[in-house]
């Protein structure tokens, strides 16, 4: 159920994962699913704890890249880079290594190291003409890094390549390419009808204090599920800053 909902309704998937944890916290698949549900809701401390638990139970190295990305989400890009250079990366399959490269490049950008991010993404997988499941995302990330570095012509070229390989629409490369080409999208909504339609005001006007504030995860709010078998469990330190 969590896997089915995680893309369409991350919050509901997270709610289901909490129930599953209460019922079967010693099942590795449950811990992993809970980790992805927390990750989809940007609860990075909780996600990292669940991924670590799942890895302890199975010894599976496939979670290494997403664990590193959790470190990025917690504002620790240096830790993510350390993980990108760890021996575990050599044990990943090709897809995992590409994912790790994407995370490392993102960490470089977090640290305002744009040139280093570009170099990190340069690889045989990027240069290959074959289309793999990761190709569109890799080309997109490279194009986006080039654009951030002010290399617009090269960025346009790679956004176009990303469009060619994005068979399932996993990126918005086509929109980014159109934006670079100066294409303007016009809303099909009839503005004259909008002018004629009465505007109903519901409820009192919200004050400045009622406005939404940015969400910040507090490590103290993270609910951990572990037992005496989780010998390596170490509670997450409270995020600094």
Write out the residue ranges for each language-model feature.
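Structural register within alpha-helical repeat arrays
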Residues: 1, 33-34, 67, 104, ...
């Amino acid at each position: 159920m969590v896997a089915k909902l995680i893309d369409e309704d991350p919050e509901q998937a997270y709610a289901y994962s909490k129930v599953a944890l209460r019922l079967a916290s010693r099942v590795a698949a449950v811990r992993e699913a809970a980790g992805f549900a927390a990750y989809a809701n940007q609860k990075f401390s909780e996600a990292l704890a669940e991924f670590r638990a799942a890895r302890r139970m199975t010894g599976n190295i496939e979670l290494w890249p997403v664990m590193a990305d959790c470190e990025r989400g917690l504002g620790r890009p240096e830790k993510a880079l350390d993980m990108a250079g760890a021996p575990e990366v050599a044990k990943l399959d090709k897809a995992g290594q590409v994912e790790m490269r994407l995370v490392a490049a993102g960490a470089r950008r977090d640290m305002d190291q744009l040139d280093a991010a570009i170099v990190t993404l340069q690889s045989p997988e990027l240069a290959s003409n074959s289309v793999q499941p990761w190709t569109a995302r890799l080309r997109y990330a490279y194009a986006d890094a080039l654009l951030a570095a002010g290399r617009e012509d090269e960025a346009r070229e790679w956004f176009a390549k990303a469009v060619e390989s994005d068979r399932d629409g996993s990126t918005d490369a086509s929109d980014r390419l159109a934006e670079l080409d100066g294409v303007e999208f016009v809303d099909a909504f009839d503005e004259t009808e909008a002018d004629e339609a009465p505007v109903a005001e519901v409820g009192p006007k919200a004050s400045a204090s009622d406005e939404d504030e940015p969400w910040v995860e507090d490590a103290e709010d993270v609910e951990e599920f572990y037992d005496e078998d989780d010998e390596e469990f170490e509670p997450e330190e409270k995020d600094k800053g």
